[in-house]
C-alpha cells in the first residue's frame, strides 16, 4: 500500500521586485522568489497541489506569458516541469487522482491537463473570474493554461464548501481564503507521523504577510486578504500546524525538498 507522504517541490523561480511581493517596500530592489508545488502520495491516488510554472516558459517565457514577463520573469529549466519532477521521484502521472488548484494565477497552473486521470479541484468563483478578470488582474491569468478540452473539474463553492476533505480521511483539507485572488484556497495537510502542515499558498506570500507586517504586492481585495490571514492564523493555532508560506525565499529554504518528504 502507498504511504501517505508530502513532497515539497519547486518549479524554478520568478525574478521581480520587492514591491511586487511586499507592497510599498524595497525601493525598487530586485527580488527572486521560489515557485513551490506539492505532491501528496496516498493509497487512494496521488494529489498534485498547483504545479508551479507551466513548462512552456522554460523555452519561451514571453511567448507563453506575454507582457507580464516585464514584471515577473520566470527562471525554469527544461527538466523542472511538474510532470518530469514527479516522474523522477518514481511516480506514474497516470496515478495522480487530483490536481488541487489554490487559484489560477500563472505560476500555479503548471499541472493542469498534464495528468490524464486527474480531477481538477478549484473554487468555482476563481474559475469563473479567470475567464473574465478585471483589468488589473488580467496579466496574471494565462487562459491557455486552464482553458483546455476534456478536463475533469470539480468546483467548490466558497464558504458553502469550506474545509472540504478531499480524501474523506482528513489528509487534505481545503480552506477558502479569498483576497489575493477572488477564489483562492489554502490547504491543510495531515500526515501520520508529522505535525499538520498549513500551506497558505498565496494567502500569505511571505512571513511578512503572515505576521501582518506587509500586504502582498498583488491582491484582488485588501479586506479579504487581511481577513483570510487572520482566519488561517486561528486555524494554524487550533491545529498546531507548521506554516508554509507561498513564495518566501528565506522560509522556503528551511523545509525538506524532494526527494526527501514528510510522512
From Swiss-Prot:
Cofactor: Zn(2+)
UniProt keyword list: Hydrolase, Metal-binding, Plasmid, Zinc
Residues spanning the membrane: none
UniProt xrefs under Pfam families: Lactamase_B
First-tier enzyme category under EC: hydrolase
The keyword RNA-binding appears for this protein: no
SUPFAM superfamilies (UniProt xref): Metallo-hydrolase/oxidoreductase
Alphabetical list of Gene3D superfamilies matching this protein: Ribonuclease Z/Hydroxyacylglutathione hydrolase-like (3.60.15.10)
Protein known as: N-acyl homoserine lactonase AttM
